[in-house]
Regions:
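Short, small-residue-biased leader/transition segments that mark boundaries at the very start
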Residues: 1-8
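Structural alpha-helical scaffold elements that stabilize or flank donor/cofactor-binding regions
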Residues: 6, 82, 229-230
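Phosphate/diphosphate ligand-binding glycine-rich loop within oxidoreductases
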Residues: 26-36, 40-147
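Glycine-rich phosphate/diphosphate-binding loop of Rossmann-like nucleotide-binding domains
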Residues: 38-50, 147-260
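Charged helix-capping and loop-helix junction motifs
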Residues: 73-77, 175-180, 254, 278-282
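Immediate post-signal peptide segment of exported/extracytoplasmic ligand-binding proteins
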Residues: 19-31, 155-158
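Glycine-rich phosphate/nucleotide-binding loop
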Residues: 240-295
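A short helix->loop->beta-strand "cap" motif at the edges of active sites that frequently abuts
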Residues: 117-124, 190, 289-295
């Protein structure tokens, strides 16, 4: 029996093949997929709308500021109400560390209870479009591409992937992308290296998940503070900037307090910290360190 993580890339490949041959992939003859974006989005917003359309669902965005939520309606009430009209609900909530994933679980629990109590005729699918912990739609898309590139999920075993911090002239980028990658790729027996300058740590619990996944899958997980070391003999490299875990904690407190001056001071501090690591950059010389220079 295939696990969900094994089945999804295969299902995605089947949909891609059907779409390429202009064969209908519509599972639904009608229906609605609702999106709730509590942070800005471009790529995920359009890819979610495209996916809904591919399956036969129309897309409707919920603007919480224009809904009854703005008048005090609870999460439970809103979740159940819109679920009468929906087959899927996608949520992005990544701004506040410790809140986004918890909110999604609260919505999920409300839907479970609504269906159990007979309030809802069906329980809509809940899609995490990025939270403070994970970005599963992106990491699963990355996994699907790796499966296509290397031929199968089985062929990913033993492949070395370097998830590395990279310099960016901005700050406050979420932890969810690198966390999603180390949490997912360690499930498939890959040798996963997480590289970042000292102090740019991820959420400790997620790192523990990656370690445990690697042990269970026969892969490996290690952390280094050298981009060169991570790139050496890597089959896949994934350079990505992110803010340190401690900074994201402080940023969350400032955002909640609506402390604009504090946010400006934190940004200035973090940009100066980032500037100390401009050598963390994916160059041609760095790529030559990868396996046969062809990662």
């Amino acid at each position: 029996t295939l696990s969900l993580h094994d089945a999804l890339p295969i299902f995605a490949a089947a949909l891609k093949a059907l779409r390429a041959e202009n064969i209908s992939t519509k599972v639904f003859n009608s229906g609605l997929g609702i999106s709730v974006f509590r942070d800005n989005s471009t790529r995920t917003r359009f890819s979610y709308a495209s996916a809904l359309n591919l399956l036969g669902l129309a897309q409707q965005d919920l603007d919480e500021g224009k809904s009854q939520i703005a008048h005090g309606e609870t999460v439970r009430e809103t979740a159940n109400m819109i679920s009468f009209c929906a087959d899927a609900i996608g949520i992005r909530d990544d701004m506040y560390l410790g809140a986004g994933n918890a909110y999604m679980r609260e919505v999920g629990a409300a839907l479970d209870d609504g269906y159990k109590q007979g309030v809802l005729p069906q329980r809509p699918a809940l899609v995490n479009l990025q939270c403070d912990i994970d970005h599963p739609t992106q990491s699963m898309a990355d996994l699907a591409w790796l499966r296509e590139h290397f031929g199968s999920l089985e062929n990913l075993k033993g492949k070395k992937i370097a998830m590395t911090w990279a310099y960016s002239p901005s700050y406050g980028k979420p932890l969810s992308v690198p966390q999603g990658i180390i949490g997912l790729m360690t499930r498939f027996g890959m040798d996963v290296t997480l590289a970042h300058p000292e102090g740019y740590d991820l959420i400790p619990d997620v790192v523990e998940v990656a370690k445990n996944n690697a042990k269970a899958s026969g892969g490996s997980f290690r952390q280094v503070t050298s981009m060169e070391e991570a790139f050496k003999d890597a089959d896949i490299v994934y350079p990505k900037s992110w803010a340190p875990y401690k900074v994201m904690e402080e940023r969350t407190e400032l955002l909640r307090a609506n402390d604009h001056e504090g946010l400006k001071a934190l940004e200035k501090q973090c940009l100066a910290q980032n500037a100390q690591h401009k050598d963390w950059h994916c160059t041609e010389e760095m790529m030559e360190l990868t396996r046969d220079g062809e990662a």
